[in-house]
Amino acid sequence: MSLIGFLNVAELGVGVAVGYSLYEPLSKNKYEKINDIMILFKYYYRNIAKIILILGAFLSLFLPFLIKGQVNINLAYIYYFLYLINCSISYLFTYKQTLIIADQKQYKIAYFLNTTKIIKMIAQCIVLYITRSFFVWILFEIIFNCLGMILANKKINFEYKNNITYKSSKTIKIIKEENAHISKNIGNIFFHKLAGFIVGQTDAILISIFSNLKETGI
């Protein structure tokens, strides 16, 4: 859904900026620095999840104006909020994956993510064939996405259990000041992300406003 894609702009490029900032301390085994960056990253992503939920709830007020044609508006709201929940939840789990990706050890979690993805797709196909229920399809999307991220995070926690605690005696304010370059990079990346969304994702929203969902899908 392009409307959910719009909400993802709230990510601001935090993941890219943090991932870039991890390369140098990882290469020099500066685990205290890495731990501080990950605490900051967790703080940012939790706030982004909250912002997406709030903005998503607000934008839902405009769904009747964005959807044309004969559509069950109640079902549209249910599907929309399920997608919104799926989007928000991902920010509570995926920040740890940035660490292992920056450390070039993504292969250690690929098994969990790929296996749950394959099982999810098979289960969704079976459900669609038997029930023709899009609601259950989205529900499976959320459940298996969460399962994959939880398993991946357990592996990441085990991988860095002796070095990364995600805890510090420092306050978030101090950690921000010590890593001011991350905020600067986030600002630079945000405008590129916004431009990319405007160019590639607004078409479907505009088509749905002036046409209907069937033509939007085509």
Name the predicted role of every residue range.
Residues 42-70, 122-129, 150:
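Alpha-helical transmembrane segments of multi-pass membrane transport and lipid-handling proteins
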Residues 87-112, 130, 135:
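Membrane-interface junctions at transmembrane-helix termini in multi-pass inner-membrane proteins
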Residues 1-26, 41, 45-52, 87-93, ...:
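Small-residue-rich midsections of specific transmembrane alpha-helices
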Residues 1-9, 37, 134-139, 177-185, ...:
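Interfacial/gating helices of multi-pass transporter permease domains
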Residues 54-65, 70-93, 110, 114, ...:
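Alpha-helical transmembrane segments of multi-pass membrane proteins
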Residues 152-201, 205, 215:
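Interhelical loop/hinge segments that connect adjacent transmembrane helices in multipass membrane
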Residues 77, 81, 111-162, 181, ...:
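Hydrophobic alpha-helical transmembrane segments
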Residues 1, 65-68, 128-131, 190-193, ...:
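Helix-terminus/linker motif at the lipid-water interface of multi-pass membrane proteins
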